[in-house]
Amino acid sequence: MAENEPQVQFKLVLVGDGGTGKTTFVKRHLTGEFEKKYVATLGVEVHPLVFHTNRGAIKYNVWDTAGQEKFGGLRDGYYIQAQCAIIMFDVTSRVTYKNVPNWHRDLVRVCENIPIVLCGNKVDIKDRKVKAKSIVFHRKKNLQYYDISAKSNYNFEKPFLWLARKLIGDPNLEFVEMPALAPPEIAMDPTLAAQYEHDLKVASETALPDEDDDL
């Protein structure tokens, strides 16, 4: 096992409101779920997620909070030495998007210039409340954004690929094979996916609103 261990490893912190699907998302990667370790002192699970790229294997040690965010903020020990992050919200819950700036503020207070991906989860659910046109925080803060659906595996690899390109410094980096993922629990409607991709493209070409607040 040891000789196959990827040389390139990154600490990735997964943050966002409770119930947005962070644990569901990280558990999709089967070997990471099988090999996860619980860090009792911080109350976190660390999932080792390996991806095979055209530049060799890389491993994200993904820190998942095990639900403590429901009791307020996370301790600095969770963020310290993080090299990248995913902030997650639930597109069916406006309040989880409204809280994104708080998560971002806590993160950058401890980790100044790390690459961050914002993910809107549960896009498989028809009753979407947070539409593409209202998702602007990432544009103001220079983050990447993806719609995802953890339960259907839709766009699962996208945040990891974007982060890998930033961390390795190679915009042409590609995944040469996909990790084994848990079978989809639901199917993402391809028509809906195409519509959302179109909506995001249109939104990205629209001027940002003028107001100065965080949303």
From Swiss-Prot:
Gene Ontology CC, one term: cytosol
Cofactor note: Mg(2+) interacts primarily with the phosphate groups of the bound guanine nucleotide.
GO molecular-function term, one example from the UniProt record: magnesium ion binding
Cofactor(s) it depends on: Mg(2+)
Pfam families for this protein: Ras
Region called Switch-I, residue ranges: 36-44
Domain Small GTPase Ran-type per the UniProt entry, residue ranges: 6-170
The entry's keywords: Cytoplasm, Developmental protein, GTP-binding, Hydrolase, Magnesium, Metal-binding, Nucleotide-binding, Nucleus, Protein transport, Transport
Region of interest called Interaction with RANBP1, as start-end residue ranges on this chain: 210-215
Residues of the site described as Essential for GTP hydrolysis: 68
Gene Ontology biological process: GTP metabolic process; mitotic sister chromatid segregation; neural retina development; protein import into nucleus; retina development in camera-type eye; ribosomal subunit export from nucleus; snRNA import into nucleus
Region ranges (Switch-II): 67-83
Tissue: Ubiquitous, with the highest expression in ovary, muscle, eye and brain.
Function, as annotated: GTPase involved in nucleocytoplasmic transport, participating both to the import and the export from the nucleus of proteins and RNAs. Switches between a cytoplasmic GDP- and a nuclear GTP-bound state by nucleotide exchange and GTP hydrolysis. Nuclear import receptors such as importin beta bind their substrates only in the absence of GTP-bound RAN and release them upon direct interaction with GTP-bound RAN, while export receptors behave in the opposite way.
Quaternary context: Monomer. Interacts with rangap1, which promotes ran-mediated GTP hydrolysis. Interacts with kpnb1. Interaction with kpnb1 inhibits rangap1-mediated stimulation of GTPase activity. Interacts with rcc1 which promotes the exchange of ran-bound GDP by GTP. Interaction with kpnb1 inhibits rcc1-mediated exchange of ran-bound GDP by GTP. Interacts (GTP-bound form) with tnpo1; the interaction is direct. Interacts (GTP-bound form) with tnpo3; the interaction is direct. Interacts with kpnb1 and with tnpo1; both inhibit ran GTPase activity.
Protein name: GTP-binding nuclear protein Ran
Lineage of origin: Eukaryota, Metazoa, Chordata, Craniata, Vertebrata
